[in-house]
């Protein structure tokens, strides 16, 4: 497990037991693993990606940090969302970041706080030189988050707006 902390949040990579509980949407099992949940996590996007995250964890015999992370409030261990990367850096050192906050925890700065910490962690790795992101054209919340983080719009495709992180 890889663990990062901010003032309010704890970010940690997802392990197989938590992934198993999430795949069954077993909120009691999630609580037994030490987390609080109001039932919003895992969301549908994360739920659909569980087979992919499991494959990465099995292939790597655990985590390298370039996979899925949960965002947890430090004061009560409630899972407020998730962030992470869509796999290891490519041969050019590029990785793609993603993030989501549970509906009841949006507009509280959790996503910016967590993603910034994760970006800093990734850029401290020798294998990472560039971070990208994408979001749907109508997802204004994610677009504002990306702008706050320092991403700039790189190009648009039929489905997504594609962003690139500009180091400060």
UniProtKB/Swiss-Prot annotation:
Tell me the domain of life: Bacteria
Assigned EC number:
2.3.1.-
N-acetyltransferase domain residues:
14-168
The record's section on Gene3D superfamilies has: 3.40.630.30
| Keywords recorded for this protein, A-Z | Acyltransferase, Transferase
**Parts forming coiled coils:** none
Q: Does the keyword Zinc apply?
A: no
MF terms (GO), sorted A to Z: acyltransferase activity, transferring groups other than amino-acyl groups
Q: Which PROSITE patterns match?
A: GNAT (PS51186)
Q: Which SUPFAM superfamilies match?
A: Acyl-CoA N-acyltransferases (Nat) (SSF55729)
Which PANTHER family does this one have?
ACETYLTRANSFERASE, GNAT FAMILY, PUTATIVE (AFU_ORTHOLOGUE AFUA_3G00765)-RELATED-RELATED
The family note in this entry says: Belongs to the acetyltransferase family.
UniProt name for this protein: Uncharacterized N-acetyltransferase YjdG
Q: Which gene encodes it?
A: yjdG
């Amino acid at each position: 497990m890889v663990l990062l902390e901010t003032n309010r949040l704890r970010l940690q990579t997802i392990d197989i037991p938590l992934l198993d509980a999430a795949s069954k949407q077993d909120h009691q099992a999630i609580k037994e693993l030490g987390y609080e949940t109001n039932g919003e996590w895992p969301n549908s996007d994360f739920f659909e990606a569980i087979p992919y995250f499991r494959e990465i964890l099995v292939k790597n015999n655990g985590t390298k940090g370039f996979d899925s992370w949960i965002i947890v409030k430090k004061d009560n261990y409630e899972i407020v969302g998730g962030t992470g990367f869509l796999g290891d850096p490519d041969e050019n050192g590029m990785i793609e970041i993603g993030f989501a906050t549970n509906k009841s925890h949006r507009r509280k700065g959790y996503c910016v706080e967590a993603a910034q910490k994760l970006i800093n962690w990734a850029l401290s790795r020798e294998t990472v030189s560039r971070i990208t992101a994408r979001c749907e054209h109508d997802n204004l919340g994610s677009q504002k988050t990306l702008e706050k983080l320092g991403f700039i719009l790189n190009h648009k495709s039929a489905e997504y707006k594609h962003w690139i992180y500009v180091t400060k």
